Amino acid sequence: MKKLRCDQTPAWAALNTHFNASGRHFDVREAFARDARRFEAFSQDAPHVFADLSKNLIDADSQALLLALARQCGLEQQRDAMFAGELINSTEQRAVMHFLLRNPPSAQYTPAQAAINKIADAQAEVEVTLNAMLAYAEQVRADAAITDIVNIGIGGSDLGPQMAVLALNEFATAGKRLHFVSNIDGDELAGVLGLVKPENTLFLVASKTFTTTETMTNARSAKAWFEARGGQDIARHFAALTTNVAAANEFGITTTFGFWDWVGGRYSLWSAIGLPLAIAIGAAGFREFLAGAHAMDEHFRTAALEDNLPVRLGLLDVWYRNFHGFSSRSIAPYSSALRRWPAYLQQLEMESNGKRVDKDGQPLPFDTSPVLWGEPGTNGQHAYFQMLHQGTAVVPVEFVAVKRAAHGLPGHHDKLLANVLAQAQALMRGKKDAGGHQDFPGNRPSTFLLLEQLTPASLGALIALQEHRVFVSGAIWGINSFDQWGVELGKVLARDIEPRLQSGDISGLDGSTAGLLQRLR
């Protein structure tokens, strides 16, 4: 029997009825007044992360109905299929096993897991590659002649490593500067090359296929710069993170670290793509990073849906997107170290769930991924928080805060924490003003994620939490969260347009593109 689409389930119909009866007019301030234990009921400890969901527009009834929706959509079975190594990336006929990259060597497997895709064999390959990569990272860390490491990659080969290196700067070794080049705009590469010397620089070329246009254009330019300035020994100063060893060798690179087709780009930070982070924080730190993520994997895999933080967050996303109609979510990390967190989440969620068809290729009659956007606090308060508090659109906000700061500057952290608490409170409480201009409607929802400290383990857990949350909403919507065909069309058209910039040929182009091309020549 064909599986019901989520909007055809009894739970979806019940959620619609509940929303129209009470959810549409739910007031979180009244909910707190009625229930002295609301904070306890809608907050949760998970590995390395505490979450307060109590300021959201949910009650026990909506949560129960969302959990019923999850069960009627087969969420548990879909989760188990991923962890069993089944080919859940249906459009590319691939397993989705990035969780293997953070499994400890002692991990045990069920007979079902061992039978599908030979998970135990894959785990052994992962450990061999991880050990080799971490040994190389320690070699680079010990090499005093290498002062600068330039990572050349884009998408998952850039956003994850860059975000994590910045976040864990407090744990980074002294004497090594990490740089990231992703954009094909030459200004970015030129800016980095102006800071480094050939004899002191290691270039990491991160491209699964070793054919990515942006990455290979930048890599070739970096190689030409290196040779033009008397750089010697390409093999020592370039390493590749790729599965295309032959192409890397042809480029002149002999040091390569690969990964597998069951690792999607936006989930590749845990693989060889994480080499920049391993160089920054060392092998022990990188293993702690993996361990934090594994702890969250186990929580997601084993916890009951009612007590499963990724599930609760993913269902909240469905509630807001499909019933309240909220089209975006603002990401507000109150940590300068997490300044690239919003950009990282943009790819993770919007590339995963920004789909308009289900797994069978059929158009969906409901909305999927929201738009994610944000800036670190307190900067965002002086930019767009005006709209969050007094604008016409309701935008759920997700705060991230760190209890203990790494720096020792007196007074700073208390002020930072006071601000994040105040913003969440102000969004909920609001303020009445007869004149209108200083009226804050309140009842604006927010989620608060709290880390005890920003460490390799807590960052790993925080990332894995978001990965699984995205899986949950994608599973409810019935989409394939692990392909990204939407990035392909523009690439194809760019290859056609590039030679036209030299030739001026506008045949077959639409009027707008033709007009712009002529002005650009």
UniProtKB/Swiss-Prot annotation:
- EC top class, in one word? isomerase
Q: Which InterPro entries does UniProt cross-reference here?
A: G6P_Isomerase, G6P_Isomerase_C, Phosphoglucose_isomerase_CS, SIS_dom_sf, SIS_PGI_1, SIS_PGI_2
- Give the EC number: 5.3.1.9
Pfam short name (any one): PGI
Record's SUPFAM superfamilies?
A: SIS domain (SSF53697)
Q: Where in the cell is it found?
A: Cytoplasm
Catalysed reactions listed for this entry: alpha-D-glucose 6-phosphate = beta-D-fructose 6-phosphate
Biological-process GO terms, alphabetical: gluconeogenesis; glucose 6-phosphate metabolic process; glycolytic process
Any one GO MF annotation of this record: monosaccharide binding
**Active site per UniProt:** E351 (proton donor), H382, K491
Q: Name one GO cellular component term.
A: cytosol
Q: In which pathway does it act?
A: Carbohydrate biosynthesis; gluconeogenesis; Carbohydrate degradation; glycolysis; D-glyceraldehyde 3-phosphate and glycerone phosphate from D-glucose: step 2/4
Q: Which UniProt keywords apply?
A: Cytoplasm, Gluconeogenesis, Glycolysis, Isomerase
Cite the PANTHER family for this sequence.
GLUCOSE-6-PHOSPHATE ISOMERASE (PTHR11469:SF1)
Please describe what this protein does: Catalyzes the reversible isomerization of glucose-6-phosphate to fructose-6-phosphate.
Task: Report the family membership.
Answer: Belongs to the GPI family.
Which protein, by its recorded name, is this? Glucose-6-phosphate isomerase
Q: Which organism is it from?
A: Polaromonas naphthalenivorans (strain CJ2)
Q: Kindly list the organism's lineage.
A: Bacteria, Pseudomonadati, Pseudomonadota, Betaproteobacteria, Burkholderiales
